[in-house]
Amino acid sequence: MEVEFMLLGKKRKLGRKIEEITVGEKLSMTEKIEDKDILLYLGLTDDANPLYIQHDYASQTPFEKPIVPSIMLTGIITSAISKYLPGPGSHILSQEIDFPKPVYHYATIEFLFEVIAVTRDEHTVVISVVGSNEKNETVIQGKVKVCPPHRLEEIHGKTLDNF
């Protein structure tokens, strides 16, 4: 049974159920980090860390120029899980993420996601993620434990009679 849900007046399909996910599945995606994305993030979170936007300050640090907030990179990961693997209806239960190298403004990051465990009795999947910059340096890596969408029962007409 394929279930759809409404989002802003548009029908959307739920992500894949646990029975449809197998170890070894991969997703690759590329993200270019633009100033507008960083400014939106900083405005939304009210984060005024000078390391993220002030060139004068950043030039006096070992980073030498402004860097992308680590949590913003984590947001790209959570968005990919919500949109693609397993997709809409998924819920992140835990994450272990490292940031071995900084990401600078205007960087292009290649993300590779891979399903490394499927535990049906716990209704969880574990997805590894690695992000690399243009120099093929790993800038983000980790594992995310996800609860894929649950199978929904059809809603019958009489169910809503009391509303």
Task: Walk through the language-model features, giving the residues of each.
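Hot-dog-fold acyl-thioester-processing enzymes
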Residues: 2-90, 153-163
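Generic structural detector for well-ordered beta-strands
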Residues: 28-32, 98, 145-147
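HotDog/MaoC-like acyl-thioester-processing domains
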Residues: 2-23, 104-163
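Beta-strand segments within the central parallel beta-sheet cores of soluble alpha/beta enzyme folds
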Residues: 93-94, 128
